Amino acid sequence: MDTMGRHVIAELWGCDVDKLNDLSFIEQVFVDAALKAGAEVREVAFHKFAPQGISGVVIISESHLTIHSFPEHGYASIDVYTCGDRIDPNVASNYIAEALKATATEVVELPRGMGPIQLEKPKVKVL
């Protein structure tokens, strides 16, 4: 293994506003994303803000998945961090982007535990 983990940071734009503000939907999507990636779910905690927006985390044996949604902007900020090399965090990230109906994504993947971080240009995809 070359890294201690892989950390995907994704900006999701043009998301379905109603889905971004649906606590049950977001929670289920994140649990499903973790399972589809092959992760083992340990704990789930999500909070809906008034008047809108959701923040949450799915703790997995391999690390975590997080979201901060901004329905008023059709935007979600997500992180998927997996330790080791058994699970591809992009599987979960892509599943979440599709479920939220994102029309554009910007994704950066960071290798973790390798010393100074060297950022590559983000991968931008217009869907």
Swiss-Prot record:
<dbReference type="GO" id="GO:0008295">
    <property type="term" value="P:spermidine biosynthetic process"/>
</dbReference>
<protein>
    <recommendedName>
        <fullName>S-adenosylmethionine decarboxylase proenzyme 2</fullName>
        <ecNumber>4.1.1.50</ecNumber>
    </recommendedName>
</protein>
<dbReference type="InterPro" id="IPR003826">
    <property type="entry name" value="AdoMetDC_fam_prok"/>
</dbReference>
<dbReference type="GO" id="GO:0005829">
    <property type="term" value="C:cytosol"/>
</dbReference>
<comment type="pathway">
    <text>Amine and polyamine biosynthesis; S-adenosylmethioninamine biosynthesis; S-adenosylmethioninamine from S-adenosyl-L-methionine: step 1/1.</text>
</comment>
<keyword id="KW-0704">Schiff base</keyword>
<dbReference type="InterPro" id="IPR016067">
    <property type="entry name" value="S-AdoMet_deCO2ase_core"/>
</dbReference>
<keyword id="KW-0210">Decarboxylase</keyword>
<comment type="function">
    <text>Catalyzes the decarboxylation of S-adenosylmethionine to S-adenosylmethioninamine (dcAdoMet), the propylamine donor required for the synthesis of the polyamines spermine and spermidine from the diamine putrescine.</text>
</comment>
<feature type="active site" description="Proton acceptor; for processing activity">
    <location>
        <position position="68"/>
    </location>
</feature>
<comment type="subunit">
    <text>Heterotetramer of two alpha and two beta chains arranged as a dimer of alpha/beta heterodimers.</text>
</comment>
<keyword id="KW-0670">Pyruvate</keyword>
<dbReference type="InterPro" id="IPR042284">
    <property type="entry name" value="AdoMetDC_N"/>
</dbReference>
<dbReference type="GO" id="GO:0004014">
    <property type="term" value="F:adenosylmethionine decarboxylase activity"/>
</dbReference>
<feature type="active site" description="Schiff-base intermediate with substrate; via pyruvic acid">
    <location>
        <position position="63"/>
    </location>
</feature>
<feature type="site" description="Cleavage (non-hydrolytic); by autolysis">
    <location>
        <begin position="62"/>
        <end position="63"/>
    </location>
</feature>
<dbReference type="InterPro" id="IPR017716">
    <property type="entry name" value="S-AdoMet_deCOase_pro-enz"/>
</dbReference>
<feature type="modified residue" description="Pyruvic acid (Ser); by autocatalysis">
    <location>
        <position position="63"/>
    </location>
</feature>
<comment type="similarity">
    <text>Belongs to the prokaryotic AdoMetDC family. Type 1 subfamily.</text>
</comment>
<keyword id="KW-0620">Polyamine biosynthesis</keyword>
<feature type="active site" description="Proton donor; for catalytic activity">
    <location>
        <position position="83"/>
    </location>
</feature>
<keyword id="KW-0456">Lyase</keyword>
<keyword id="KW-0068">Autocatalytic cleavage</keyword>
<dbReference type="InterPro" id="IPR042286">
    <property type="entry name" value="AdoMetDC_C"/>
</dbReference>
<dbReference type="Pfam" id="PF02675">
    <property type="entry name" value="AdoMet_dc"/>
</dbReference>
<keyword id="KW-0745">Spermidine biosynthesis</keyword>
<keyword id="KW-0865">Zymogen</keyword>
<keyword id="KW-0949">S-adenosyl-L-methionine</keyword>
